[in-house]
Amino acid sequence: MTKGTPSQGKHNKGSNHIVCRRCGRRAFHVRKKVCAACGFGRSSKIKRFAWQWKKVTGKGNRVK
């Protein structure tokens, strides 16, 4: 094995995120033990923000 730039390309094996057991998305960070999508591991509440939905003027439901 040599050192240098060619060797750095071999460092991209493996994955940081696995499937989250709460939301089912591939967003659970293995080392941090936190889901990037739903916040599992950090809080008991599902992670959500107002900017995720389009603002509605007048009557009607919010559209995702």
Curated annotation (Swiss-Prot):
Manner of cofactor binding, per the entry note: Binds 1 zinc ion per subunit.
GO MF term set: rRNA binding; structural constituent of ribosome; zinc ion binding
Positions annotated to bind Zn(2+): 20, 23, 35, 38
Pfam families attached to this UniProt entry: Ribosomal_L37e (PF01907)
Cofactor section: Zn(2+)
Gene Ontology CC entries for this record: ribonucleoprotein complex; ribosome
Source organism, top-level taxon: Archaea
PROSITE patterns reported for this sequence: RIBOSOMAL_L37E
Zinc finger C4-type: from-to: 20-38
Protein keywords: Metal-binding, Ribonucleoprotein, Ribosomal protein, RNA-binding, rRNA-binding, Zinc, Zinc-finger
GO biological process entries: translation
HAMAP family, sorted: Ribosomal_eL37
Sequence similarity: Belongs to the eukaryotic ribosomal protein eL37 family.
Function text: Binds to the 23S rRNA.
Name of the featured protein: Large ribosomal subunit protein eL37
Species the sequence originates in: Methanococcus maripaludis (strain DSM 14266 / JCM 13030 / NBRC 101832 / S2 / LL)
